[in-house]
Swiss-Prot record:
Active site residues per record: C12
Protein name per Swiss-Prot or TrEMBL: Secernin-2
One Gene Ontology MF term: dipeptidase activity
Domain of life: Eukaryota
Location of Phosphothreonine modifications: T52
One annotated Gene Ontology cellular component of this protein: extracellular exosome
Family listed: Belongs to the peptidase C69 family. Secernin subfamily.
A biological process from GO: proteolysis
Length: 425
C-alpha cells in the first residue's frame, strides 16, 4: 500500500523573480532539492532528438507515447530515476517540482512520478505555459503515482511545480489528476511543499470545482480558495514546518524586491536558519540550481548547478546551451542496467553505490572541512573563488563585455566541473 503520510520527511523550496523584482531584465529561477541525505543527484545533459512516430518511451515505472521531436535538456536528478527534480531546456524553460499532500488520496500503483512529468515537459515545451499544458495533459492521461524514494518501503505523494521562461512564470499545484495554476507576470514567488494558490486562479482542471462540491469541500457559493479547499484539514507537524519555510522564503524575497540577482538567489538557497538549506536527520539539500533567463532573446540563458549536497559548501557552476555541449562525466552516476534495483522486481530489494566522481570528491572535502578547520577553510575559499569566477564570467557575457567562441560557451560547465574535481583531488 502506498504511503502518503506527510509526516515523512520530504521538503523542497522553489523561487522565481520576474521583473521588476529582478535587478536585471531577466527572470531568475532557483531551487533546493531536499531528499534522503545519502541519495546521489547527478547532472545529465540530454541532446535534442527525433523519434519514430508511435514509439514508446520508458519513464521511471511506466511507458508513455513518445513525441516526434524533443528539446535538449539539462537535468539535476536523483540518479536512480528517469525524471528530474529540476532542470532547463534549450528554449529557456525551467521547472522545479515538490511533494505535496492534499485531501485527494495518493493513488495505488505505479504511474508517472512528478519528476517524470517535469522532464517530459522540458523535452516537449518551448515556453512555461506550454510546459503547463504538457504536464496537465499527461496527468490526465497517465496519472501520477509510484514510489518516490529508492526504498523498499513505499512512499508516494502528489506534486506542485514552479515553471519559468524568459517572460513569466507559472505555479501549478496538483491533487491527483486535478490541478490549479497561477500565472506570475511580475514580482517574486516561492513554493514550499504546500498548496499556495488561493482564489487567484489563472487556469484549472475543468472538473476542479464540481469535484470539490461533490465531496462537500465547497458549497458552490463562496469564494473558491484552492489551497483552503484542498489542503488537509488537520495539518501535521511536517506541514507546519513547510509553512514556516514558505513564509521565511517569501520574506527573504520581499527584502530584496527590485534587487534580486543570481547571487541573491544563491544566498537564499544557502539560508540555514529558515530551514531552506536543509540538514535534518535523514534528509538534506542534495542539489541546488539557479537560472538567469534574460528577457532579450539574443542573450543566452545561464543555469548554475551544484551536483553536490549542501549549497552552503558547494559550487554553483555555469551551464549554457550551445555548440560543444556534452555530458560532464564527473557528474554522471554509474549505471547498472537490468540489475539496477529500480528495474528488478520486486523493486529496491538491494542497494548500489551511485556516487559519481564529483560527489566522492565533495564528500571527502566535507569530511576535511569538519576535521581540519584551517585546511577546510582553505578548501572552502577555493570553492568560493571558483564560483565567483563563474558568476563574473557570465555577468560579463550578459553585459556584452565577454564574447567567447560558441564552443567555449558550450563547454563552460564541463570546464568548471573539471576544475572543482581537481580542487578536491
Amino acid at each position: 500500500m502506498a504511503s502518503s503520510s506527510p509526516d515523512s520527511p520530504c521538503s523542497c523550496d522553489c523561487f522565481v523573480s520576474v521583473p521588476p523584482a529582478s535587478a536585471i531584465p531577466a527572470v531568475i529561477f532557483a531551487k533546493n532539492s531536499d531528499r534522503p541525505r545519502d541519495e546521489v543527484q547527478e547532472v545529465v545533459f540530454v541532446p535534442a532528438g527525433t523519434h519514430t512516430p508511435g514509439s514508446r518511451l520508458q519513464c521511471t515505472y511506466i511507458e508513455v507515447e513518445q513525441v516526434s521531436k524533443t528539446h535538449a535538456v539539462i537535468l539535476s536528478r536523483p540518479s536512480w530515476l528517469w525524471g528530474a527534480e529540476m532542470g532547463a531546456n534549450e528554449h529557456g524553460v525551467c521547472i522545479g517540482n515538490e511533494a505535496v499532500w492534499t485531501k485527494e488520496p495518493v493513488g495505488e500503483g505505479e504511474a508517472l512520478l512528478g519528476m517524470d512529468l517535469l522532464r517530459l515537459a522540458l523535452e516537449r515545451s518551448s515556453s512555461a505555459q506550454e510546459a503547463l499544458h504538457v504536464i496537465t495533459g499527461l496527468l490526465e492521461h497517465y496519472g501520477q503515482g509510484g514510489n518516490c524514494l529508492e526504498d523498499a518501503a513505499p512512499f508516494s505523494y502528489h506534486s506542485t511545480f514552479l515553471l519559468a521562461d524568459r517572460t513569466e512564470a507559472w505555479v501549478l499545484e496538483t491533487a491527483g489528476r486535478l490541478w490549479a495554476a497561477q500565472r506570475i507576470q511580475e514580482g517574486a514567488r516561492n513554493i514550499s511543499n504546500q498548496l499556495s494558490i488561493g482564489t487567484d486562479i489563472s487556469a484549472q482542471h475543468p472538473e476542479l470545482r464540481t469535484h470539490a462540491q461533490a465531496k462537500g469541500w465547497w458549497d458552490g457559493q463562496g469564494a473558491f480558495d484552492f489551497a483552503q479547499i484542498f489542503s488537509l484539514t488537520q495539518q501535521p507537524v511536517r506541514m507546519e514546518a513547510a509553512k514556516a519555510r514558505f513564509q521565511a522564503g517569501r520574506e527573504l524575497l520581499r527584502q530584496r524586491q527590485g534587487g534580486i540577482t543570481a547571487e541573491v538567489m544563491m544566498g537564499i538557497l544557502r539560508d540555514k536558519e529558515s530551514g531552506i538549506c536543509m540538514d535534518s536527520g535523514g534528509f538534506r539539500t542534495t542539489a541546488s540550481m539557479v537560472s538567469v533567463l534574460p528577457q532579450d532573446p539574443t542573450q543566452p540563458c545561464v543555469h548554475f548547478l551544484t551536483a553536490t549536497p549542501d549549497p552552503s559548501r558547494s559550487v554553483f557552476k555555469p551551464f549554457i546551451f550551445g555548440m560543444g555541449v556534452a555530458q560532464a562525466p564527473q557528474v554522471l552516476s554509474p549505471t547498472f542496467g537490468a540489475q539496477d534495483p529500480v528495474r528488478t522486481l520486486p523493486r529496491f530489494q538491494t542497494q548500489v553505490d551511485r556516487r559519481h566522481t564529483l560527489y566522492r570528491g565533495h564528500q571527502a572535502a566535507l569530511g576535511l572541512m569538519e576535521r581540519d578547520q584551517d585546511r577546510g577553510q582553505q578548501l572552502q575559499q577555493k570553492q568560493q573563488d571558483l564560483e565567483q569566477e563563474g558568476l563574473e564570467a557570465t555577468q560579463g557575457l550578459l553585459a556584452g563585455e565577454w564574447a567567447p567562441p560558441l564552443w567555449e560557451l558550450g563547454s563552460l560547465f564541463q570546464a568548471f566541473v573539471k576544475r572543482e574535481s581537481q580542487a578536491y583531488a
